[in-house]
Amino acid sequence: MTNFNVMLAHPVGKKEFDKDSFIQPKLDGVRCYITYHGAFSRNHKRFMNVQHILDELRPLFNKYPHVVLDGELYNHDYKDNFNKIISLVRKQLPSDADIEEAKAIQFHNYDIFMPDTPDNSFEYRNESIKNLHKEFTLQYCKTVETYQVQNDVTARLMYYQFTNKQGYEGAILRNNKPYEQKRSYNLQKYKEFHDTEATIIGWVEGQGKRTGTIGKFLARDADGNEFGMPVMDKMPVLTKMYDIAEWYIGKTATFTYFQRTPSGSYRHPLFKSIRNYE
C-alpha cells in the first residue's frame, strides 16, 4: 500500500472528545507512514535517508506485509531543533556521511492500520503496536507513550505533563474509533501558541485560488529578524486587505507563533491583527 492517506487531526475545541479516549504527546517531527514498500511522507513522497529504520523493520514486514505503520521521524534530543530533523530526513541523494548522521533519527510509531481489519478500535491498534515491539528487536523504532483519559481535567493534566515536564509541543487526543484516512474529529490536537509584535515591511500575493488576495505579510521584529507571516481569513477580507496592502507598511502587527527557532526566527507565525487598538 503506497497510496495510504494518514489520519489528520483537528484542533481541540470544536467538538468534544469521547469519554475513555487516549492521549499521547504531540511530536514536533516529520509525519511518516511506513509500508512493505518503504517510508513515505503524508503526501506520498519517499524518504531516501532512513534506510537504518527500513532495514530493522524488514523482518516485521516480511511477516506482516500489509500493515501500515503511522508515526513521525523524530528524536526528542532535537525537540528544539525541528530544522535539524528536516535536514536529516529529506535528503534525496544522501552521501555516506548523510546516511550515518541520519541514524540519529528514530521512527516514533503512534498508530497502525491493518487493511484486512480496518474497523479496529484505537485501543486494539495500540495493543498491536506494543505486541509488535515485543515480537521484533527494534532499536530505531519507538512506541509513543499512550494513556487513557476519562475527562477534560485528566487530559489537561497530561497536557501539562507532556509540555511543561517533558518538553513536547503539545498533546494528541484519540477517540477509541477506527482509523480514518482523512482529517477527523476522532483525532484532536492540543497546542499552545504565543503572540508578539513586528513591523510590516511588505506583502506577498496569494497563489492559486487566493490570487488577488493577501497571502502573507513580510515583517521585521525588534531584533531585526525578517520573516513572513501568513494571513488567514475569509476571502472578501483577504481581497480587501490586498487592495489596500500599501496601507499596512510600517504598521505594527500582532502575530501568533509556536516557538522560536535556534536562529531566532519563528515557528508557524500567523498574522493576527494590526496593533492600533490601544
Predicted regions span which residues?
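Phosphate/adenylate-binding "loop-and-lid" substructures adjacent to NTP/NAD/dNTP-binding pockets
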Residues: 1-14
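Covalent nucleotidyltransferase
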Residues: 14-138, 277
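Extracellular/periplasmic catalytic domains that process cell-envelope and extracellular macromolecules
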Residues: 101-102, 164-165, 211
